[in-house]
Amino acid sequence: MQNNTKFKAYIMLMRLHRPIPILLILWPTLTALVLASHGIPDIKYLIVFTIGVVVMRTVGCIVNDIADIDFDKYVERTNTRPLTSGKLSVKNALYLCLALTIIAFICVLFLNLYTILLSFVALFLAVLYPFCKRFFAIPQLILGLAFNFGIFMAFSAIENQIPLEAWIFYLSTICWTIAYDTIYALADRDFDLEIGIKSSAVLFGDKVFKYIFLFNFISLILLIALGIYLSFNIIFYIGVIISAFLFIRNYFLYKKLGITNCIKAFSDNHWIGLIIFILVVIQYL
């Protein structure tokens, strides 16, 4: 029984019981693979990048819980996490984090030297984000850089370069990430204000909804720019319009505030990532 409890604690530490953030990282990465391949990517890249996304997401979660262990106990949503509640020790977490990092590095060894070098930047960003909440006003920006860095790695792995379309798509996904993680941060804003944690939801204050709209809008404009640059057909732009309607639908959900509404609005963003992925695949059929 004790082993079963500890196993569940490890699952919670790695957030494997909540797969939506994995999808939020995976869809842009897979989309970048399709863009770089000008069609369906080689199975090797699909396997390596999918494993890499899952593993690095879990590494980020573990580092986050280690960094926030003294803060999480004051936040209603996080005070039952394995490290905060004592179900696992920091030593347990560090060993797991090291093992997962080694797995990620083994995966990247199947790629070219350029991508291997970029993987160190990806690791740095993943580790940096949890600590930014102490000193950086918009840690969601760092999260956007980290979550979507797989875009650069996808292009470097296949094309051995980072072309203009990669930059356009990367900037679009960063804006998208800032928007949806600001929604997520709304769930904890009152607690963050009390304990001095920084977030875009805290920084934007009463204008937070306007800023979420702004970042979503910029994200869509950059997607349109990507479509124009790559000469995509009308189907792509119809999908962008559908994404805009989903952003509007989410607005009426997260505007109600409350943990449940904010988490639901945050989670629903993965459908937008899926839509863009499907639209890009269609362009190369």
Swiss-Prot record:
Q: So what EC number does this one have?
A: 2.5.1.39
Give a yes or no for keyword Transmembrane helix in this entry: yes
The record, for CDD domains, names: PT_UbiA_COQ2 (cd13959)
Question: Which cofactors?
Answer: Mg(2+)
Q: Which Pfam family, any one, appears in the UniProt record?
A: UbiA
TM segment ranges: 20-40, 43-63, 88-110, 114-131, 135-155, 166-186, 200-220, 265-285
Which terms in the GO cellular component ontology are assigned?
A: plasma membrane
Listed pathway(s): Cofactor biosynthesis; ubiquinone biosynthesis
Keywords assigned by UniProt, alphabetized: Cell inner membrane, Cell membrane, Magnesium, Membrane, Transferase, Transmembrane, Transmembrane helix, Ubiquinone biosynthesis
Q: Does the keyword Transferase apply?
A: yes
State one molecular function term (GO). 4-hydroxybenzoate polyprenyltransferase activity
Q: Which reaction does it catalyse?
A: all-trans-octaprenyl diphosphate + 4-hydroxybenzoate = 4-hydroxy-3-(all-trans-octaprenyl)benzoate + diphosphate
Where is this chain's protein located in or outside the cell? Cell inner membrane
Job description of the protein: Catalyzes the prenylation of para-hydroxybenzoate (PHB) with an all-trans polyprenyl group. Mediates the second step in the final reaction sequence of ubiquinone-8 (UQ-8) biosynthesis, which is the condensation of the polyisoprenoid side chain with PHB, generating the first membrane-bound Q intermediate 3-octaprenyl-4-hydroxybenzoate.
What is stated as this protein's family in its record? Answer: Belongs to the UbiA prenyltransferase family.
Could you identify this protein by its name?
A: 4-hydroxybenzoate octaprenyltransferase
Q: Which organism is it from?
A: Francisella philomiragia subsp. philomiragia (strain ATCC 25017 / CCUG 19701 / FSC 153 / O#319-036)
Q: What is the lineage of its organism?
A: Bacteria, Pseudomonadati, Pseudomonadota, Gammaproteobacteria, Thiotrichales
| Gene transcribed to yield this protein | ubiA
